[in-house]
Amino acid sequence: MDSKRAALESGDGPDAKRLDTTDDQDKEASGGDGSQVMLAKHVAPYTGHGCTPPMESYLFEPTPAGSQLLPWKTSVDLDNDAELEKPTSDKKPDTAKLSRRELAKMRREHTLRALALERELTNKPGQTPASEVLLVRFPDPEITAPMLAGLSKDIRDVVLPISVAPRYCLVHLKAGADVEATICDINRVRFGTGHLRAELKPFSDEEQAEFIDPCSLYVGNIPFNMTTSAIKAYFANAMRVDIGVLKREKRARYAFVRYASPDQTMEAFKELVDSPLNSRTLTVRYRRLRKRAGMPMVQCATSFQALQSPNGDDDNTDCKVISPPPLESIIISDSDNCSDSSGNGKEDGKRKKKINEQEREIEKLKRQMAEYGAIIKSLQFRQNSLEDTFIPDLTPKVEPSVNPTGCLLGSNAVHLMRDIKKECDYLGIPDPVPATKPTTQAQDDSQKKAKRSCFGRLFTGPFRRGTSAMKTADEYEKDDRLEELYAQLERDPDP
């Protein structure tokens, strides 16, 4: 209770704040803000046991009998609530919560406003009007499904593409051309089995505004010597700036400038129209969206087929056959339950992506194995070819001999060698052994033997001298005998 009294005396309590608002309505102030309490209107209630009523009882007015209790609200509070509700009602609707129809309607309004602003600021009184457009139709014969179905009785259905429609084209005339005279000249031209037909093609404002982007501007005639950073700095309030170079005129640049909202785009359009930039006047207009020419679509049209009617007497009764609807892709789920597989589209997409990655890795490994196999085969082929080229010649070769009979040719050399061998056997002369160069290993062995038999050389010295003398005498005798035989062979005539 004391805290409430202190709050009321200081003017910080809730009751004091509410009573502060009543001062604007010329009402009497309450005791919470330091003013006097009027006891004539604030009567203390009866306590019943002689206690002094609290000070809070003087702050409330007595409620008359039969009145209805209402919540604590003053007229000022009601006014404040109304003011709080006003900005919420004046707020623009959120585009994310709008339907497609409302969004299309809003975009149509923005494009019409942009087209009107462009016409107002770009079309001047002395400027030539825009060129007229003519629609020229070609005299192509009309092709229908019943006509094609009547070509043969075996035709069940006819599917017509869009390309069978009669052809036409749009022709833009020069500025100031005579439209009526041009139409008459075109209509007199013979084409195929008929004549061309030309007519004026009027474009409504909605048709022209359909291709306008209300948030993007086309800015042309930008100086070529300006850098990209300088051009982007010139459009400081833009969200995005795409810069390009004209194909025909290489001395000028253009830019597509995009803003956050259509209103900002209109303000920028007003500022940029006919504004100078480095001694050049900018060309500004709203960006046009082009419709991309897609692939020729096949249009499933209704066809008429001649069928036999079992209930009718006429055999040529025409029956209208409606072609089936176009097929759509069906996703088959592997789960046991018969639930719709559209909910698991993300999981299926991830699974397919993993399978595709695994297949790619397998194909990559296969390609690497094939490359390695080709390299191994090429190396084997090279090795075989090198072996064929470097095979040693195993045929015996005749080495030069000291024997002069080795120079003889033919069968005489064979007979002479036989005779020499017989004479050697008869005389007891052994076959000559070719002198070989002793190896290092033999030298080592002889050194070892010499080390082992160093003490025996003292006792075997005279004997070794006699044997060496005998060997030299025998060798001399053999050489003399061979010389005699060679001389005899030279003297004997050939048999």
Swiss-Prot record:
Q: Which GO terms describe its molecular function?
A: chromatin binding; mRNA binding; RNA binding
Keyword list, A-Z: Chromosome, Nucleus, RNA-binding
Region annotated Disordered, chain positions: 1-51, 332-358, 432-451, 461-495
Q: Which GO terms describe its biological process?
A: positive regulation of gene expression
The record describes its quaternary structure and partners as: Interacts with Zeste.
Which compartment or compartments is the protein found in?
Nucleus; Chromosome
* Gene designation per UniProt: Pof
Which classification does the entry list for the species? Eukaryota, Metazoa, Ecdysozoa, Arthropoda, Hexapoda
Is Acyltransferase found in the keyword set?
no
Record-given protein name: Protein painting of fourth
Q: What does this protein do?
A: Probable RNA-binding protein that specifically binds to the fourth chromosome and may bind an RNA that spreads the fourth chromosome. May be a reminiscence of X chromosome dosage compensation of ancestral Drosophila species in which the X and the fourth chromosomes are one single chromosome.
Q: Where is the composition biased (Low complexity)?
A: 332-342
Q: Where is the RRM domain?
A: 215-289
Task: Identify the tissues in which this protein is expressed.
Answer: Weakly expressed in embryos. Expression increases during larval and pupal stages. In adults, it is predominantly expressed in males, while it is weakly expressed in females.
Keyword presence, Iron = no
